[in-house]
Amino acid sequence: MLYASYMSYVSIKMHASSNGAHISGAETLVDESRAYEFLSSFYQRANTHSKGKPEITTLTIRRIKDADIITIPALEVKCLPALHPSEAHRQVIEQLSNVVSPTIAQMALHTVLNARNMRGAILLCAHTGQRLDPYDPQRGVRASTFGVTPQESAGPTLNKSHFNEALVLASKVMSAPGIVAEICISDDPAYTTGYVTTENTYIRIPHMKDPYSPIGGRVFLLDTRVSTPEDTISYLEQKPVLITGVN
C-alpha cells in the first residue's frame, strides 16, 4: 500500500430515498478542485434513477487528510458465462466454495437473493454464516471513502459505468482485514449482471437476476480469526482509499 501524493482531497457522497426506501447512492474521493463536477453529477443521477425520483436527496462533502489516504491496486477481472439466473447462481456457489464451505456459500447466496432496499452490505461470518453488522438491518455496512487515482479519473458522468464503479468498491472491500469474499447483485432493476470476489479476483457473472426484478444487495464474508467485525467495519467505512489500475 502506498500513500497518495500531496493533493487536497474531499469525500463526496450522495444518498437518495423515498418514504424511507433506498433509491440511489454514489460516492467518490477526489481532488477538491473537482468537487462541483461530482456534486452536480450525483444530484442529476439521483433524479434520473430507474426507481423514480427521490423524495430526499442528501449530498455530503468532507475534507480528507492527505496523510490518511492509501493507494491500492484494483482487483484482477474475470468473466464467467451464464444464460439464466440458476446457472449464474451455480457459478457463484462454485467460486465461493473455493474460500468458504459449500454450506456457507449457499447461505451467503440465499442472503443476497433476499435482500431488499439495503443501504449497505450484510456482513456474515465466513465460518458460521452469522450476521455480524451491528446496525439497523436495512443499513448494513457501508463501504465508503474511496475513489480512483487522479490520472485514471475520467470525471463524473450521468450514465455511470456499473462495472467500473463496482470494481472500485470491490477493490476496497477486498483490501479490508479479514474479508475473504463478496457477492453483489445490483439493485438497479434494469441491470442484471452481478459479481463475486474471491482471492483478489473480481468475477463478473451475467443474468444474476431476471430483468426488472426487485432483488439487489451485497454480502461481505469475514474471517473472524483474522479480524474483528469492529476493526473491519472501521476500515470499510472510514479508511480513505484510492484505487489504481481501473481502466
Curated annotation (Swiss-Prot):
GO molecular function, one term: magnesium ion binding
Top-tier EC class: ligase
Catalysis performed (reactions): heptanedioate + ATP + CoA = 6-carboxyhexanoyl-CoA + AMP + diphosphate
Pathway entry: Metabolic intermediate metabolism; pimeloyl-CoA biosynthesis; pimeloyl-CoA from pimelate: step 1/1
Keywords: ATP-binding, Biotin biosynthesis, Ligase, Magnesium, Nucleotide-binding
Coiled coil: none
Cofactor: Mg(2+)
EC number: 6.2.1.14
Keyword Ribosomal protein: no
One Gene Ontology term from the biological process aspect of the record: biotin biosynthetic process
InterPro entries associated with the record: BioW
Subunit structure: Homodimer.
Family: Belongs to the BioW family.
Task performed by this protein: Catalyzes the transformation of pimelate into pimeloyl-CoA with concomitant hydrolysis of ATP to AMP.
Protein name from the UniProt record: 6-carboxyhexanoate--CoA ligase
UniProt source species: Corynebacterium diphtheriae (strain ATCC 700971 / NCTC 13129 / Biotype gravis)
Encoding gene, per UniProt annotation: bioW
